[in-house]
Swiss-Prot record:
InterPro entries for this protein: Nodulation_NolB
Source superkingdom: Bacteria
Segments of this protein annotated with the region Disordered: 37-57
Expression triggers: By flavonoid signal compounds.
Pfam families: NolB
Keyword tags: Nodulation, Plasmid
Function: Regulates cultivar-specific nodulation of soybean.
The protein, known as: Nodulation protein NolB
Length: 164
């Protein structure tokens, strides 16, 4: 069975002329809209938000501790008062006129403040942490299974009660 096919070359000028005409019409409308926007902005005063001056904040080296980076950022935000590192009694002090840069380490008394609470010191910290996370994961999995089981039982009991 043969189907009549219209030649592409015969129909192309008709299709192209209408699409080119639409494109030209669109471009004219776009140009008119741009001109009217220019006229509107020229007649009304331009309102711009005030731009704050850029702050001189430098990124700390990735090897510096987090506390030093935080103190440097705070010091850059408040250049009049430099924030010093916390003393062993955990109180931070503001120093006026201190040189900028990372905080200096305070002398530590023997055995005072050298260990963190709840975190064992030594090379086995990572292994202990992984074991703790594994136990936590197992506990959460058990709770999820019990919760799903109770939900299934509750659903079954509700169906039985509805059926009578």
């Amino acid at each position: 069975m043969m189907l009549p096919v219209t030649s592409i070359s015969n129909s192309l000028p008709r299709v192209a002329s209408s699409s080119f005409g639409e494109q030209a019409q669109f471009e004219r409308a776009l140009a008119q809209a741009a001109d009217s926007m220019k006229n509107d902005t020229a007649s009304t005063p331009v309102r711009t938000a005030p731009i704050s001056p850029p702050m001189d904040v430098h990124r700390a080296a990735p090897t510096s501790p987090l506390k030093d980076r935080v103190l440097q950022t705070i010091s850059a935000i408040c250049p009049d008062s430099i924030v010093a590192a916390a003393a062993p009694n955990h109180k931070a002090a503001l120093i006026s006129g201190a040189p900028p840069g990372p905080s200096q380490k305070l002398p530590v008394e023997d055995g005072a403040g050298t260990e963190r609470l709840g975190i064992p010191q030594g090379g086995h910290d990572f292994d202990v942490m992984v074991a703790g996370l594994r136990d936590l994961y197992n506990g959460v999995t058990q709770v999820a299974l019990v919760s799903k089981g109770i939900s299934g039982i509750t659903s079954s009991v509700n169906k039985l009660l509805k059926e009578g």
